[in-house]
Every structure is written in structure tokens, then in C-alpha cells.
Amino acid sequence: EVVKDHSSVGANLTDHLMLRPVYKIKNLETLNDIYYSISKKIITGLKFLLFRKGPLAVGASYGCGFIKSDPHLETPNLQFHISPASTDLLGKSSLHKFPAFTPTITNVRPTSRGTIEIKSPDTRVSPKIKMNYLSTDEDRDIAGKSIKIVRNIVMNSNAYKPYEPEELRPGINITDNETLAIEAGKFANTIFHPVSTCRMGNDEKAVVNDRLVAHGLSNLRIVDASVMPHITSGNTNAPTIM
């Protein structure tokens, strides 16, 4: 039985999309090399067990930073992570059999919006989720710009020259923003920051008020990232806990 029908529940779905260009390199060992070598895996394990050092002592990303896609912006709108590994489809395919790294890029203020809807009263049935990533001109333009920023850093900075980087994905010959966004989107992944499907506010399209009580109901509160009016310009875990 439906107690309260609110059309905005499940709307306004917002997430951070992680673009994953890949650069093949030389003269440097990456996690790809360790993954396919029994001896290197043993050494890596011993380093961690005995000294708490090595690749197992850090997370999947070795560095993180924020930057502007346009210098005229007041605050950074891109988040970068550097991972010393590469694969085609994250979580679905093995690491590449050559040394490479992945400088991931995330537009932390996307304008694309998706939806999540129930398909059945049975809660065991998975919902219908439509993310609509890169569905706006602005998001595609920023995606293209962000790929170019990474490309410029990797291919033109002195720090990377000893490793002779080669852009495998999306491809050095792709230069226009629209095509870059399309190609990068083929290998992109969520960074697991879905928010805003039960948006907080006082307007008629808001789902909860500033006390997190659902509009039209007195005994239901929603306390998770779905109540965020807008996605945060960074990771969502800490703001949710706060």
C-alpha cells in the first residue's frame, strides 16, 4: 500500500563519474608487473608482513589532487587520482600485461542527472537505475578538457620523460572534446558517490525538510547521502557522517 506518493523520490540522481585514461610506460615497475609475477607477489607480501611497507601498505590510488578545468573558475572542479595499474574494465577484466598507470579524472560538479525507480513492490527485485552520465554538453566539454589536461602533464612534463609514456586510451590522435568524452565514457566507472534522490529543501519538489523528515509524513526520516541538495565537490562519505 502506498502511504505517500512523491514524484521526486528517485529523481535528481547525481554521481561522480571516474574517467580512466591509460598510459603505457617503460623503465618503471607497476602493479601490472607484480600481478603477473609469482616471485614479485611473494616479495610484496613479505614487505608488508615484515615491514608494513610496499604496495599493500597503501590504497589503490597513490596520490590525489584537485584542479580547475578553466582558470577563471573560483574553485577546482576536477579531482585526480593516480593509480600505478591499468585495466580495460574496472572490476571486470584483469590488469594489463605491461607496465602502465591510470590517472583518473572526476568532474566533481556534474550537471547530468539520472533516476532510480522501483520495478516491483517486491523489495528483492533490483530497481531500475538510469545514471545518464555525460548527458549534458557541459559535462562532455569538461570531460574533454580534463583528458587534455592529463595528456599535457603526462606527455610534456620532464617528470614523465624517463618513462616514455604512450597514451593507450582514449588515444593521442583524438583531440576534440566531444569525441574525447565519448571515448573516455566507454571505459569510465562510478566512483561510488550517488546522492540527491531524496533531496532536502522546502520547495514542492524536495523530499525531506531541514530536519530530514519526509514531507507529508511525521514519522519517517531519511538520513543518508540521498538528502544532499547538491553533490559535494569531493568525496561524499565524510559529509554524510557529519
Task: Say what each PLM segment does.
Residues 1-50:
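Glycine-rich loop(s) and the adjacent beta-strand/alpha-helix scaffold that form part
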Residues 26-29, 42-239:
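FAD-dependent oxidoreductase catalytic-site/capping-region signature
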Residues 242:
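Surface beta-loop-beta hairpin patches that serve as ligand-binding interfaces in beta-rich domains
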